[in-house]
Design a protein with these regions (language model features):
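Hydrophobic anchor at the beta1->P-loop junction of P-loop NTPases
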Residues: 14
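Short glycine-rich anion-binding loops that position phosphate/pyrophosphate groups of nucleotides
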Residues: 87-89, 111-113, 160-161
Length: 182
């Protein structure tokens, strides 16, 4: 048995605010663990045949969240993988319950100033369009942190390079699952 085999038994679901690195870290984590990677946002876009920004503009956030819930449900019915969820996905009680049942959840957490700097460079996020990223993040943190705290594992990422964060996640998962990484 290789040292990462215990980490491949269940899906690893990454949760956290926008800009924390769920997709970037998720891809690298999946590669390190030899697991498939799934990005819930990309899967929603593929299922809808349009971008998230278009879904928000045409149908609104509730329609997007419903599609997101359905996509995550489908993904969690499949074999183990690393799943990058959308920032609001874990806020849905049904999605959260399913993640708790079928996956190990990891909250990637970073300082809001770091996240604001990261997302300020990217104008495709519909929740920050035309708004101050830090103000949006502060409001989201207030609403979401108590729910994110229900995650199985919490990893404080700081402003570390993605490969460092991957190592932190592997170490935290290994500790949580009670399997020594050799």
């Amino acid at each position: 048995m290789d040292r990462y085999e215990p980490l491949r038994r269940r899906t690893i679901a990454l949760v956290g605010l926008m800009g924390v690195g769920k997709s970037s870290v998720g891809r690298r984590l999946a590669s390190a663990l030899s697991l498939p990677f799934r990005d819930a946002d990309a899967e929603v876009e593929a299922a809808a045949g349009r971008s998230i920004a278009d879904i928000f503009a045409a149908l609104g956030e509730p329609a997007f969240r419903d599609g997101e819930r359905r996509v995550i449900t489908r993904l969690l019915e499949g074999p183990p993988h690393v799943l990058a969820t959308g920032g609001g996905a874990y806020m849905n009680a049904e999605t959260r319950a399913l993640i708790k049942e079928r996956a190990v959840s990891v909250w990637l957490k970073a300082d809001l100033d770091i996240l604001a700097r990261r997302i300020g460079r990217k104008d495709t996020r519909p929740l920050i369009a035309g708004k101050d990223p830090l103000e949006v993040l502060q409001a989201q943190a207030e609403a979401r942190y108590p729910v994110y705290a229900e995650a199985d594992v919490i990893v404080e990422t700081g402003d570390a390079a993605h490969h460092i964060t991957v190592g932190q996640v592997i170490e935290a998962l290994t500790s949580y699952l009670g399997e020594p990484a050799k």
